[in-house]
């Protein structure tokens, strides 16, 4: 039902400020989830089960983190046909993020620029929201560091968040690739990443012993990486036996949107312009890690064919964000069906 209504809703939403439209949509989905209206909105998406990280996904098309930073609309989002939901990024303490305006549409390029800056209500409220959700599918919880935490102490924030979210997560994503938190991408460097992942894997094992279950860790990386950086990241993932990698976050490049309104705004660019760069990172990373570290492909998916290309590049699962904002829930079903056809061809 919602899929057929979305084109009409989008016309109104796209007349609003991008962030205001974002919040309005989340409030509506949150209300739908709380009142049971989500059942009426439920999308008809075929099952296409896939097992990755030891988890069985209803279908391989998920929602990327960033849309629901506080986990406040999980049930409403789950009704739209996604095979898995990822919420966050959340930080130890609440923070407002960067000053507004901080989200911009580039409709001529099917793109967004955002410099949100991990705005969220903190991990304690996040956990309460997750616990209140009725959704029992695969739920990824995405964690980051507070803006005022020195980069040298970033591991403390990640370890704190990991401990808080661990009992409630199907998997936990370590976000070290947002361009909107100062110096965060330094953590992708070989030495910094090695130290961070060593600490996280040690904490993961201790939490697994405490809770009686091993919750997989996924690392989210940037598209703005050279070949040597991709190789180093791949080696580090293998060395620490990280369960998955999400490729990729937003890009700082503006090559594909030069001259367009808002193109010079600071922040990360997402949508169609990041598709090729994301696929290239996926291909190179897959060449390094093979099947030992599953890849979740995200960046610029606007059609079922785009999702298929991501899998052909080496991804095991895909996630939607900007394409979902532009095309709505119909994109979820289209991607699932395209992937299912590919597997039966």
Curated annotation (Swiss-Prot):
Give UniProt keywords alphabetically: Cell membrane, Flavoprotein, FMN, Membrane, Oxidoreductase, Pyrimidine biosynthesis
Q: Where in the cell is it found?
A: Cell membrane
Its BP terms in the Gene Ontology are: 'de novo' pyrimidine nucleobase biosynthetic process; 'de novo' UMP biosynthetic process
What EC number(s) does the entry state?
A: 1.3.5.2
In this chain, substrate is annotated as bound at 69, 114-118, 175, 180, 249-250
Q: Which reaction does it catalyse?
A: (S)-dihydroorotate + a quinone = orotate + a quinol
Role description = Catalyzes the conversion of dihydroorotate to orotate with quinone as electron acceptor.
Give the multimer and partner information. Answer: Monomer.
Q: What is this protein called?
A: Dihydroorotate dehydrogenase (quinone)
Q: Which organism is it from?
A: Burkholderia ambifaria (strain ATCC BAA-244 / DSM 16087 / CCUG 44356 / LMG 19182 / AMMD) (Burkholderia cepacia (strain AMMD))
Q: Which gene encodes it?
A: pyrD
